[in-house]
Each structure stands twice: as structure tokens, then as C-alpha cells.
Regions:
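A structural signal for multi-pass alpha-helical bundles of membrane permease subunits
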Residues: 1-188
Length: 188
């Protein structure tokens, strides 16, 4: 979704798309701590508090601005002549994006995926606010935190669960390190 949005914002430049880019990336400037109480009230009102669906919708909403921003900055480096040659060959805008431009975004896509997955996997505050009341929907980091109590801390369980929580992030980073470096360098 973010890559297609960034493609349209970059290729169809006018005052409306410039305004849309500003509106889409503006939430990156607002710290989560300033909206967390009102967000919790809204999610409780619409019965999404305590559910995995509600948590997923929030992660999706918070991740879109950064992903669009990263894709947009990379799109600016792709020459427009590539689009024009695809149009000459008879491709429409969607085919140009899906068959020509999107394969060029492989390294940036992996970078966005790794950044988002690591952010979601390691996040503590949002799941603590939204799904802490139910044992079925707790994340692994919250489950590790449940071993730390006010008067008693079970360090052996807490440390074992933290190792399990850190392990997937390390494995993902090691496997996709090449793409992460390419994506960060390409977007610079």
C-alpha cells in the first residue's frame, strides 16, 4: 500500500499530491505518548481494546507514514524515463508500477519490512495499553514482563523469555542484512 501511494505521489506531482504527501507523513511528527490516552479511549469505545485485530489496525496506521516516506524518497531516485518507456510499450499506470517499478523497490521493501517487524515485535507500550488485560492476546514481551512483580521477580523465567523475544529479531536481521544495507544506502 505504501509503495503504491509513494509511486502516485511521486509521479503525479501537483499541489494536491504535495498536500497529500504532507498529510500522510505528518503523523511521524506526533509522539505516541501524546495520543495514547485518547487512542485507548477510542479503541475501548469501538470494542477494539484487548483484541489482536485492534492492535493490528493501530500498527498498520502508525506504520503507513514512515513506510510511505521511505518509499517516496527512494522513488525520487528512479528516472521517469523508465515509466515513459513502459507507457510506449502499452502498459498502463498499474502495470508500470507492478511490473517495472516494484521490482526495483526490492531492497527498500525489505528495509521497510524489517524496520516494521522489529518495531512491532519489540514494542512494549502499545500492547501494554491495548491488550494487557487478556492472557490470550499478550505479546511475548508482555509475557516476559509478567514474570517481574512488585515483591517477587522470577529472573530465570524473565531472562529465558527475553532471549526468546530477542531471537527472532536477530535472525531476521542476519538473514536480511544485505537488503537492509542496500535499502538504507539507496534511500540516502
Amino acid at each position: 500500500f505504501s509503495s503504491l501511494t509513494a509511486y502516485i505521489l511521486d509521479r503525479k506531482r501537483n499541489r494536491y499530491t504535495s498536500f497529500a504527501k504532507t498529510i500522510i507523513t505528518m503523523p511521524m511528527l506526533i509522539p505516541f505518548q501524546t495520543i495514547m490516552i485518547s487512542l485507548l479511549k477510542v479503541m475501548t469505545t469501538i470494542n477494539f481494546s484487548g483484541s489482536k485485530v485492534g492492535l493490528g489496525i493501530q500498527y498498520w496506521g502508525f506504520g503507513i507514514p514512515m513506510a510511505t516516506f521511505i518509499f517516496f524518497n527512494f522513488m525520487e531516485t528512479i528516472p521517469r524515463e523508465i515509466d515513459e518507456s513502459a507507457y510506449i510499450d502499452g502498459a498502463d499506470t498499474f502495470k508500470t508500477f507492478s511490473l517495472v517499478i516494484f521490482p526495483l523497490l526490492k531492497s527498500v521493501t525489505f528495509t521497510v519490512i524489517v524496520i516494521d517487524v522489529m518495531w512491532i515485535w519489540n514494542d512494549f507500550l502499545l500492547p501494554l495499553l491495548m491488550v494487557n488485560s487478556s492472557n490470550d492476546t499478550k505479546t511475548l514481551v508482555l509475557a516476559a514482563y509478567s514474570f517481574v512483580g512488585q515483591f517477587n521477580t522470577q529472573w530465570h523465567y524473565a531472562m529465558a523469555s527475553m532471549v526468546l523475544a530477542i531471537l527472532p529479531s536477530v535472525v531476521i536481521f542476519i538473514l536480511l542484512q544485505k537488503y537492509i544495507v542496500e535499502g538504507v544506502v539507496a534511500g540516502a
